[in-house]
């Protein structure tokens, strides 16, 4: 990692998104810049027994997205999201047929894997949990795929005709950043010229909702779904569960230039830390997240004063938003008080491993379009969250350097720096 300044440079040349609201980067970006929220009462199952009954679900029809009958029947929603997002990224990049298959790889990220299908199929083979020994006669032949997240990378490799490095990253809520850093390392180290990388999670299921209910991490604001997610607001009381996927085509910069590809942004630096402290708790001083941000900026050769925008984790839990505020002050110094910071979780919820990939997509689009989406529902700022969290309304601004961060259960903290392609170091 210390040699990154002298290594090959990595740019994003394709983006594909499946998000609450619609499929594609255009509706995704329009929704964010309009400040529209996707939180609604959960429709995929009866959520009335649960404390939190709202979520940001994707309006996703796999058949309408061109998936085959086998893909519709056999694939978990997480896999379907990943496949469609990767397909969109490949089409956006125009790289198909222009890269050596042996120099093209795949990295997929997920926090929960195929949770929904595991939930459903266990109910089938165990007679709704009444059988101690499951009846495999009622199982499905592809049930094994639900247990191995690597099947997601395999399906995308077949789609991309990628015969190079492949793998999976599962690091909870930092998976979407961490998978991109691993993929970028493979390009920088010369193991690949092109990587298809991203993250997907579709975990709006009874077992997941019950888990977050148990630790009171999700909001019980069921009577106000559209305003339920309130990052940095005095009245915040938990996050909204979401779902989705974002995949990218990462290329070595010279390779992208040779084929005349458009580059959205350069992945200039990244770093991760763990607080080694608690599965769910965060230190109030934000030390580990601050260290990740500082290290990522150092690797990118970016001074804190040069950061134009910060994409916050912004989960709308009491402790996270205070933790982040402290981390930004610690890592950015006086500039923390003037740089715009916002959370798109206020609009699309928290899709676990996928969310920070969606946030990287939004960050790259900010550089492309020069607009900063707002933090929706931020009407009563917490006086202890006293930075510029871009309340309610998007802003036009020249953005050439972005920091995006993520915090995950287990104490994982990750940061990634995106810059305009070809920036002088």
Swiss-Prot record:
Organism lineage string: Bacteria, Bacillati, Actinomycetota, Actinomycetes, Kitasatosporales
Cited CDD domains: KAS_I_II
Coiled coil: none
Assigned GO CC terms: cytosol
Record PROSITE patterns: KS3_1, KS3_2
A GO term for molecular function: 3-oxoacyl-[acyl-carrier-protein] synthase activity
Superkingdom of the organism of origin: Bacteria
Active-site residues, as the UniProt record annotates them: 173 (for beta-ketoacyl synthase activity), 313 (for beta-ketoacyl synthase activity), 350 (for beta-ketoacyl synthase activity)
InterPro entries per UniProt: Beta-ketoacyl_synthase (IPR000794), Ketoacyl_synth_AS (IPR018201), Ketoacyl_synth_C (IPR014031), Ketoacyl_synth_N (IPR014030), PKS_Beta-ketoAc_synthase_dom (IPR020841), Thiolase-like (IPR016039)
PANTHER family per UniProt: 3-OXOACYL-[ACYL-CARRIER-PROTEIN] SYNTHASE, MITOCHONDRIAL (PTHR11712:SF336), POLYKETIDE SYNTHASE-RELATED (PTHR11712)
Any one biological process term the GO annotation gives: antibiotic biosynthetic process
Family the UniProt entry places it in: Belongs to the thiolase-like superfamily. Beta-ketoacyl-ACP synthases family.
Keywords, sorted A to Z: Acyltransferase, Antibiotic biosynthesis, Transferase
tRNA processing recorded as keyword: no
UniProt domain Ketosynthase family 3 (KS3): residue ranges: 7-420
Protein name from the UniProt record: Oxytetracycline polyketide putative beta-ketoacyl synthase 1
């Amino acid at each position: 990692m210390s040699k990154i300044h002298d290594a090959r440079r990595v740019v994003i040349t394709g983006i594909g998104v499946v998000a609450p609201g619609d499929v594609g980067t255009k509706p995704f970006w329009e929704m964010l810049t309009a400040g529209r929220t996707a939180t609604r009462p959960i429709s995929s199952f009866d959520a009335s027994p649960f404390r939190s009954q709202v979520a940001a679900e994707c309006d996703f029809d796999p058949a309408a997205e061109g998936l085959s009958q086998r893909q519709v029947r056999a694939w978990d929603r997480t896999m379907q999201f990943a496949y469609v997002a990767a397909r969109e990224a490949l089409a956006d990049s125009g790289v198909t047929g222009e890269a050596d298959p042996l120099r093209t790889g795949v990295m997929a990220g997920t926090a929960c894997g195929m949770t929904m299908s595991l939930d459903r199929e266990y109910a089938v083979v165990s007679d709704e949990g009444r059988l101690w020994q499951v009846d495999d006669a009622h199982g499905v032949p592809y049930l094994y795929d639900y247990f191995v997240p690597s099947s997601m990378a395999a399906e995308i490799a077949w789609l991309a005709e990628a015969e190079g490095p492949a793998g999976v990253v599962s690091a909870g809520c930092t998976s979407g950043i961490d998978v991109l850093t691993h993929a970028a390392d493979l390009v920088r180290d010369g193991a690949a010229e092109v990587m298809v990388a991203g993250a997907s999670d579709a975990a709006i299921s009874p077992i997941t909702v019950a888990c977050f209910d148990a630790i009171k991490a999700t909001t019980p604001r069921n009577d106000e779904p559209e305003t339920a997610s309130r990052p940095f607001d005095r009245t915040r009381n938990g996050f909204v569960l979401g779902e989705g996927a974002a995949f990218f085509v990462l290329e070595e910069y010279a390779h992208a230039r040779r084929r005349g590809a458009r580059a959205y942004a350069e992945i200039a630096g990244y770093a991760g830390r763990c607080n080694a402290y608690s599965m769910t708790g965060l230190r109030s001083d934000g030390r580990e997240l601050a260290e990740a941000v500082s290290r990522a900026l150092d690797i990118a050769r970016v001074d804190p004063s040069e950061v134009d925008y910060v994409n916050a984790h912004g989960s709308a839990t009491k402790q996270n938003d205070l933790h982040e505020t402290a981390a930004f002050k610690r890592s950015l110094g006086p500039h923390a008080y003037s740089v715009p910071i916002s959370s798109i979780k206020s609009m699309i919820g928290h899709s676990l491993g996928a969310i920070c990939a969606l946030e990287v997509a939004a960050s790259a689009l900010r550089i492309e379009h020069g607009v900063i989406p707002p933090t929706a529902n931020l009407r009563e700022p917490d006086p202890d969250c006293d930075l510029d969290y871009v309340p309610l309304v998007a802003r036009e601004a020249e953005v050439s350097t972005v920091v995006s961060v993520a915090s995950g259960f287990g104490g994982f903290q990750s940061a990634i720096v995106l810059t305009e392609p070809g920036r002088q170091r």
